[in-house]
């Protein structure tokens, strides 16, 4: 089975995630758009990435940042037109970059034509495209709650029925039990494949097989049957990359999702490592120090268990997560060193690495002085709730600085010009004030920058197959500072070794490997033998 997998282009690929709203504005309205991305393709080619994962750009009322789609076969005017999208796919292809689309197949917007028809009458051909239950007003079918708070059922008086929504009331769940719904979805995906889409990231895909009467939302009984049919009818007709977003995935489920026989997805996003710095049993806002030993154990487990029978997605950042250099590095004194250290650890592992826009510049979290400067709905809701619960403003702002989603969404920092070169207008979200120091223009003029370090990591993955195929062995498992592992393929071994802290760390491995070839290193001059300096990281081959 391992053999069949090797031909897939995505095995040694590196993917760059763009949050279009914050990447590059081309028309001065303060919102990033598709033409802006086209203008920056040469920058991405220089970095060396193979594909762009585009956060949602389909037509949407934007109730949930585009994850509420009202037309799967059109582009939201905020980002441009269908012609712009076709041009982006074409221009990216000229540079050997594929475009991965973000699709939401669990639910649509309530403004989608299907739902507008569905609520006209119980006899409407589109009625069964959604999940309905008869009932009485005020007496819910059951006590299920939506992810965004409140009941998961919404009353439609004309029909005397409730519809089911796992997310907002404006995101009714699609009824995957209905073969007509599935056919519509497959036809839409084939249409995008025809237009040249290189792959798909599938939002909350583990929730499509819900059974609300049994209170089952994710991992429903027919989930793998549905995914395998989806794959057969669409993805397997082209050499695409497909990524399932599966918050509920454990190792065994991930093996099914990313089976090398290609029956489901290329890989999944799992989030076990991302939840390690919150207090047990509490919300993401209740921050706890990162247990480095636990982080090593979790990442090593996924490396070992999926080797040869599945495939990992490797990521520190996305549009919902705080900037990794602020989160688990040091974004002040050791910003450059810790940004490079975190990159070294991730890019040495087996799987497909994802770089989130600005990560390659070492962009940091933002600390706006006032809540009015924030735009993220989750952040604003939490602020209100916690004030009512008696938290102090300082405590709440501390949580927002650490975990708020706007940390990832401040505009891309292109230059030291006004608004960081992102827009000639007023940006939809303020630019991080540190753009005068941290920006692409200054990174590109400095050979020791974070940007060129990422470029080199990407090249190493292409040059040495050990990073793609090699076995993984964790070393110094209980050490609270040193994160070290070996990748081995045939006679080739690579040591990846890093100090995950701002104090020097003893590391005897260095003397054992002193005759090896240093592939990459985030310090310029040699230090004391057997000691790793703050956030020092390297890869050594022998």
Mark where each language-model region is:
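Active-site and adjacent substrate-binding regions of carbohydrate-active enzymes
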Residues: 1-542
């Amino acid at each position: 089975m391992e053999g069949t997998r090797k031909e897939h282009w995505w095995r040694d690929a590196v993917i760059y995630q763009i949050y279009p709203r914050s990447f590059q504005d081309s028309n001065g309205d303060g919102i990033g758009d598709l033409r802006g991305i086209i203008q920056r393709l040469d920058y991405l080619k220089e970095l060396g990435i193979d594909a762009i994962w585009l956060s949602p750009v389909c037509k949407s009322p934007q109730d949930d940042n585009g994850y509420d789609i009202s037309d799967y076969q059109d582009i939201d005017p905020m980002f441009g037109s269908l012609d712009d999208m076709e041009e982006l796919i074409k221009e990216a292809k000229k540079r050997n970059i594929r475009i991965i689309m973000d699709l939401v197949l669990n639910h649509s917007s309530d403004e989608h034509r299907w739902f507008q028809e569905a609520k006209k009458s119980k006899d409407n051909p589109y009625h069964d495209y959604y999940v309905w239950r008869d009932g009485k007003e005020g007496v819910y079918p059951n006590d299920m709650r939506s992810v965004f708070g409140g009941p998961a059922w919404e009353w439609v008086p004309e029909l005397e029925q409730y519809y089911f929504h796992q997310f907002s009331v404006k995101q009714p769940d699609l009824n995957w039990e209905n073969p007509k719904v599935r056919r519509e979805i497959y036809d839409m995906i084939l249409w995008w494949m025809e237009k040249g889409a290189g792959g798909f990231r599938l939002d909350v895909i583990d929730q499509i097989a819900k059974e609300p009467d049994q209170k089952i939302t994710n991992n429903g009984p027919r989930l793998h049957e549905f995914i395998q049919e989806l794959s057969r009818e669409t993805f397997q007709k082209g050499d695409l990359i497909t990524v399932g977003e599966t918050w509920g995935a454990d190792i065994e489920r991930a093996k099914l999702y990313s089976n090398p026989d290609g029956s489901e997805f290329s890989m999944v996003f799992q989030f076990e490592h991302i939840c390690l710095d919150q207090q047990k049993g509490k919300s993401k806002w209740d921050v706890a120090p990162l247990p480095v030993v636990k982080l090593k154990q979790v990442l090593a487990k996924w490396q070992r268990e999926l080797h040869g029978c599945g495939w990992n997605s490797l990521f520190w950042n996305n549009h919902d997560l705080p900037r990794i250099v602020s989160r688990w590095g040091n974004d002040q004194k050791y910003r450059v060193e810790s940004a490079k250290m975190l990159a070294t650890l991730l890019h040495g592992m087996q799987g497909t690495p994802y770089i989130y826009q600005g990560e390659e510049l070492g962009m940091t979290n933002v600390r706006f002085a006032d809540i009015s400067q924030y735009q993220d709905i989750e952040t604003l809701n939490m602020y209100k709730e916690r004030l009512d619960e008696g938290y102090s403003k300082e405590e709440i702002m501390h949580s927002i600085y650490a975990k708020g989603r706007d940390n990832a969404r401040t505009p891309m920092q292109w230059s030291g010009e006004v608004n960081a070169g992102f827009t000639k207008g007023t940006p939809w979200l303020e630019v991080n004030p540190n753009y005068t120091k941290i920006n692409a223009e200054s990174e590109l003029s400095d050979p020791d920058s974070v940007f060129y370090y990422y470029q080199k990591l990407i090249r190493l993955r292409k040059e040495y197959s050990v990073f793609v195929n090699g076995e993984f062995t964790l070393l110094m498992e209980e050490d609270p500072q040193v994160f070290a592992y070996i990748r081995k393929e045939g006679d080739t071994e690579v040591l990846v070794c890093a100090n995950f802290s701002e104090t020097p760390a003893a590391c005897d491995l260095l003397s054992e490997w002193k005759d090896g070839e240093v592939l990459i290193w985030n310090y310029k001059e040699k230090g004391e033998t057997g000691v790793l300096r703050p956030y020092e990281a390297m890869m050594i081959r022998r």
